[in-house]
Structures are given as C-alpha cells and as structure tokens.
UniProtKB/Swiss-Prot annotation:
This is Toxin CaTX-A. Belongs to the jellyfish toxin family. Type II subfamily. It is suggested that CaTX-B is synthesized in the tentacle, is modified (become CaTX-A) and then migrates to the nematocyst. The keyword Zinc-finger does not apply. Has potent hemolytic activity. Is lethal to crayfish. Causes cutaneous inflammation in humans. May act as a pore-forming toxin, disrupting normal transmembrane ion concentration gradients in susceptible cells. Keywords: Cytolysis, Disulfide bond, Hemolysis, Ion transport, Membrane, Nematocyst, Secreted, Signal, Target cell membrane, Target membrane, Toxin, Transmembrane, Transport. Contains disulfide bonds. The keyword Transmembrane applies. InterPro entries: Pest_crys_N_sf. It is found in: Secreted; Nematocyst; Target cell membrane.
Length: 463
C-alpha cells in the first residue's frame, strides 16, 4: 500500500471516530429545535399584545418552527440567533415609524450575515418571509421606496457575498481534486484501482450547479440598468470564467489519463470529451455578448470597456480565448484625428461651436472634417478633443457636451467607446457610466448625454 493511500485510510478513520453517534445527534437536534420553538412562541406572545393583525408574521415564524425540525443541529442553533434578532427588533417595529421598521429589518439581515457569513439555506427563505411580513404589517403606505431600496440592496449584497463564498469553496475543491489527479497521473503502472479512484473523485457534473447559478446571475445582470448590478455582473463573469476553466482543465487531465490507460477507458475518454465540448459551448454562449454588444447590454459594456481599465476586464478577455469567443471590435484609439458621425442623422458629425466665451459641441451637416482627436489615456479611457478644446459632459440632467482648454477634463471627460455589432459605438464617461453621448433633435443638434439608451441618436461611426 502506498504512503498516499495509507494517509487516506488514516484520515477516514479519524473522521469516522470524530463524530458522535446518530442517537446523540438526534437528541441534540430535538433539543435545539425545541429551544427555537420556545423562542418563537415568546415572540408570537408579544405580537398578540400589539393590537393589530399579525397573522402573516405569525405564519412566517411558524414556518420557521416547522423547517428547523428537519435541519441539522448546527443550522438550528444559527437560526435561533436569527429568531432572537426578530424578538430584539420588535420594539422598533412597534413604533410604526418607517425608518424604525427599516432599521429593524436591517438588524435581522445583519444578524443573518454575521451568523451564517451570508444568508444560507433555510435562513434566507425564513428571513425573506419574515421581512416581507414585517414590512406589510408595520410600514403600510408610509414605507418610502428609498427605504425599501436600502433593504433590497442589503439582500443583494449578502446574496452576492454568499455566491462569491461558494465560488471560493469550489476553487478549493478543485485544487484538492486536481492535486489528487496529478498525483495519480505520475504513477508509472496505472491499475484499475487508480483509475476507479479518479472516476470517483472527479464527477462529470463538477461545479455544474454553481456555474448554473452564475449563468442565471449573469443573464439577469447583463441587461440591467442599475450601475451596481452591472458592475457586479462583470465581476461574476470573471469568477464564472475562472471556474469554467478549472472544470475543463480537470476534465482534460482525466481524459488524458483514460486515453493513456486505453482499452475500456477509451469510451470514458470519448464521453468526457463530448461533455467538455458541450461545456465550452455553453460558456461561450453565456459570455459572447461582451464582444458582440447590443444596446440592451450597454451598461455592462460601460463597465467592461475599455478592457485595460480593470483587472477583471483584462482577465475576462484572456479567459474568453480559452473558449473560442471572438475578440471584440476595436475599442481603443491611438491619438489620431477622426470624424464622429451620428447614426440617426448620418449627414451630421460632431463639431464645436463657440459663443460668448463658451464652447459647446454640436452636430454639423455634411462635414468631412476629420478634426476630432481621440486619445487613449494611461488609465484606459479616452479624451475627445476638437480645436484645442477637450469635451466633457456636465453634471446636469441630460448634461451638455462642453469644451475646456484644460488638458485634463477629469472623469466627466474620460470617455468609453463601446463597440456594437452594427459597427457603431456607444459612448459614456467614467463619471457617469449609465449616461450615453447623443445628438439632440433640435436645429443645432447639440451633443448631450442620455440616461441608459438613446437609440440611434446615441450611436456613432468613427471615421
């Protein structure tokens, strides 16, 4: 017996003797569940004193009572902490003040995050139900949308943190399994025992559930019009591609091992090869939108382009090559002079108008003047300069495109060029990624910025 297999046997024996008997676990679980049930009964008793309809909240708490009976003792103990936080927050709920209600809800969410490191399993369902009941019961119509947004954002934050934690756990699992497979690969005389141990260690569906969750998250976020959501989506794409590469690396190692063994294992190698091809195709379909941009993905594009402005974007570009995703269209410019022609009015291009000491950018008809200098900065973004004046977008609603003599226009004048599949570009700024440069429909055709998607008026041909 090899030293490695001896260590595995020792580890198995240690783990086998480290856990208490099933009977002891069962008694411990019943005791913990009873404690939670008692706490919930106490809270329901307090609710009865409120003098208002608390049916939904009681039902939510009773749902927790039933759910914990099926959970491991360790989970029940954690849920007990959450239930306690509900009881501790009742004084805030009783006031009826919407800010107190929101504060109480956030206390519960924070308790979940502290106890679980993220709302896991039973906790997230229980907490979501409790929060919903509390909001409907105590806040009524006085609950402002801004307060609700705070609570929704808190849930998003902890859900995302949970997902990131799970990805990190999957990476650790991968590292352990790939180390084991590599050790077997170095064995000169492969036996059926070696190959069967690899087959048991490497599941064909490794990481499938996690990647499926990430795919769903990416598909939702790719069309979001919320800045934070779009930014998180880019980060999740990076994690998704990392995990996908790990999975295919692992499968490739096993395929090579089976091919080396030959015989009956050739069929297993072929089956895994087909699975790997299907995996790569699914990954390619999930992320190709970044390099084949449509307007509905434009906000994600504002956080992905220019690619060399962030480590996540650089990492995504490198990893997409592994899956055969086509490179994006040109998204950087080298300081030469160009003409920016509008798609909606293709006889109009950006020019500059000076009036009373002010410099405004607008559209000029039938202009063939290639006088706009698009220069790439060290941070990856670009400046747009015309006749010594650098364009920047003002902070006003649908801000104007003004010009400054300053060499550095600041983040309002750091532009991102997002390449669309139709050959045009959408243009946003580092300062306001969700506002896109467009030509207004007035007689002057002034250059302004529009929130989210200005359609053809906000699409530009760079000539």
């Amino acid at each position: 017996m090899s030293r490695g297999y001896s260590l595995h046997l020792v580890l198995f024996l240690v783990l086998s003797t480290a856990f208490p008997s099933q009977a002891r676990l069962s008694r411990y679980r019943r005791s913990a569940a009873d404690a939670v049930s008692t706490d919930i009964d106490g809270i329901i008793g307090q609710l009865n004193d409120l003098g208002t309809d608390t049916k939904r909240l009681k039902e939510a708490l009773q749902g927790v009572q039933e759910a914990v009976k099926k959970e491991p003792a360790t989970t029940i103990a954690k849920v007990s902490t959450i239930v306690g936080s509900v009881g501790g927050s009742l004084s805030k709920f009783k006031s009826g003040d919407p800010f107190d209600v929101a504060s109480g809800c956030l206390d519960i969410i924070a308790s979940v995050a502290t106890t679980f490191g993220g709302p896991y399993g039973i906790a997230i369902g229980a907490v979501a139900s409790l929060i919903s009941s509390i909001l409907s019961l105590f806040s009524g119509n006085s609950m402002g949308s801004a307060i609700k947004q705070v609570i929704d954002d808190a849930f998003k934050k902890y859900r995302d943190q949970e997902l990131e934690d799970n990805v990190k756990g999957a990476k650790r699992t991968f590292n352990a399994v790939i180390t084991f497979v590599n050790s077997v690969s170095k064995t000169e005389n492969l036996t059926e025992v070696h190959l069967d141990s690899v087959r048991d260690a490497v599941r064909v569906d490794a990481f499938t559930n996690m990647l499926g969750v990430l795919e769903s998250r990416i598909n939702r976020g790719s069309v979001s019009t919320d800045n934070n959501e779009a930014m998180r989506t880019i980060n999740f794409i990076f994690l998704y591609l990392q995990l996908s590469v790990m999975r295919e690396t692992l499968l490739t190692q096993v395929i090579l091992l089976y091919k080396r063994a030959g015989g009956a294992y050739d069929e297993l190698a072929l089956s895994l090869s087909l699975t790997s091809d299907q995996n790569k195709e699914a990954t390619r379909e999930t992320v190709t939108f970044l390099h084949q941009m449509e307007t509905k993905y434009s906000l994600c594009g504002s956080y992905y382009y220019p690619i060399d402005h962030s480590k996540a974007a650089i990492g995504i570009l490198k990893l997409t090559k592994f899956f055969g995703v086509p490179d994006p269209a040109r998204y950087t410019f080298d300081g030469l002079y160009y003409r920016m022609q509008n798609r909606a009015w293709n006889r109009y291009s950006i020019c500059k108008e000076s009036y009373a000491g002010n410099h405004m950018f607008r559209g000029c008809k039938d202009s063939s003047y290639h006088g706009i200098r698009i220069k790439k900065l060290e941070n990856g973004y670009h400046t747009i300069t015309l006749r010594s004046k650098a364009m920047y977008v003002t902070k006003h609603a649908q801000g104007w495109g003004w010009g400054t003599a300053d060499e550095d226009p600041g983040e309002q004048g750091y532009f991102t060029f997002i390449p669309l599949t139709n050959g045009f570009y959408m243009v946003s700024t580092k300062k306001w990624p969700d506002y896109f440069v467009y030509m207004e429909s007035s007689a002057h055709g002034y250059i302004r910025s529009w929130h989210y998607n200005p359609d053809p008026q906000g699409q530009w041909k760079i000539l």
